[in-house]
C-alpha cells in the first residue's frame, strides 16, 4: 500500500465531503412529481382521455382512500380501470429520502419509480424527470469532482510540470496563454490549473502505470470514455438534453464508469 502524504489525504477528505453533498443531500424528492389518482372503478377510456390532456403517462389508482397501484395511459381501453391497473412492485417503490444518484441506477432497470411518504405512495419519477436541474447539477458536480481529482493526481505524479511530455506543443501553448492571462489578474495559480479536461485525459492515458492504477483497461477505452464525458459536460453546460447523442443505457454506463473512476481516484 502506497503512503499518501497528509496534504493529499486532506484533499481527498474534502473531495469526499463535497461528493457526499452531491450524493446524499440531494434526494429523489427534488425531481419527483405529485401523482394524481383516479378511482378503481372509473371508466378507463375517460381516464385515458384525461391523461392525454394532462400529458400523464401513469396515474395512481385509489380504492377506499388508499393508492393501490397505477394505470399506464397506453394500456387503457374499454372497461373500468380495475381491469388495467397494476399493483406496485417492490422494485418500483423507494423512500422519499433515497439519494438522487441511486435514482439513476433504479431507472436503469425500470421505466418509473414511485415515492413512499410514510406508508403512502404520493409521487412518481420517470426517465423524463432525469432532464431536471437537480440531476444536471448532480452530474456536473460528479464531473467537476473528477476533474479536481485528476488535477490533484497529476500534480502529485508530475512535479515541476513534467506532465508536458504527454501534451503536444499547441496544447501547452494554450495552457501557457491562459496561465499568463490569469496571472495578470493576480490569481494565485500554477500552470496545471490551466489544463482542460482533454489535457488531463491525455496526460493520464499516456502514462501507463497511472492509467492502470486508475483502472482504465486500455488507452482506446479511456479515450472513448473521456470523449463521452466531454459530450455530457458540454450538453449540461449548454442546457441541452442530457442524452442528446446517447441512449439512456449509454448514459447510465457513463455514470457508472465515472463513479468507478472517482472511487479509484479517492484511493490515490
Where are these predicted regions, by residue range?
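Tandem CBS (Cystathionine beta-synthase) repeat/Bateman regulatory domains
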Residues: 1-268
Amino acid at each position: 500500500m502506497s503512503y499518501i502524504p497528509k496534504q493529499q489525504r486532506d484533499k481527498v477528505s474534502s473531495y469526499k465531503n463535497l461528493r457526499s453533498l452531491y450524493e446524499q443531500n440531494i434526494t429523489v424528492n427534488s425531481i419527483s412529481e405529485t401523482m394524481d389518482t383516479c378511482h378503481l372503478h372509473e371508466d378507463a377510456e375517460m381516464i385515458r382521455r384525461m391523461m392525454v390532456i394532462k400529458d400523464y403517462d401513469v396515474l395512481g389508482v385509489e380504492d377506499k382512500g388508499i393508492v393501490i397501484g397505477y394505470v399506464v395511459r397506453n394500456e387503457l381501453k374499454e372497461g373500468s380501470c380495475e381491469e388495467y391497473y397494476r399493483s406496485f412492485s417492490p422494485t418500483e417503490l423507494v423512500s422519499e429520502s433515497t439519494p438522487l444518484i441511486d435514482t439513476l441506477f433504479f431507472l436503469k432497470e425500470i421505466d418509473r419509480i414511485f415515492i413512499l411518504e410514510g406508508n403512502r405512495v404520493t409521487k412518481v419519477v420517470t426517465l423524463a424527470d432525469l432532464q431536471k436541474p437537480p440531476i444536471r447539477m448532480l452530474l456536473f458536480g460528479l464531473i467537476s469532482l473528477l476533474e479536481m481529482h485528476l488535477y490533484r493526481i497529476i500534480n502529485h505524479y508530475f512535479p515541476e510540470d513534467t506532465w508536458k511530455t504527454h501534451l503536444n506543443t499547441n496544447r501547452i501553448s494554450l495552457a501557457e496563454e491562459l496561465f499568463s492571462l490569469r496571472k495578470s489578474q493576480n490569481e494565485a495559480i500554477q500552470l496545471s490549473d490551466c489544463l482542460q479536461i482533454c489535457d488531463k485525459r491525455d496526460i493520464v492515458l499516456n502514462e501507463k502505470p497511472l492509467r492502470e492504477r486508475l483502472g482504465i483497461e486500455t488507452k482506446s477505452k479511456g479515450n472513448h470514455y473521456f470523449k463521452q464525458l466531454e459530450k455530457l459536460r458540454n450538453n449540461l453546460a449548454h442546457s441541452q438534453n442530457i442524452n442528446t447523442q446517447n441512449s439512456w443505457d449509454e448514459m447510465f454506463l457513463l455514470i457508472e464508469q465515472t463513479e468507478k473512476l472517482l472511487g479509484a481516484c479517492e484511493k490515490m
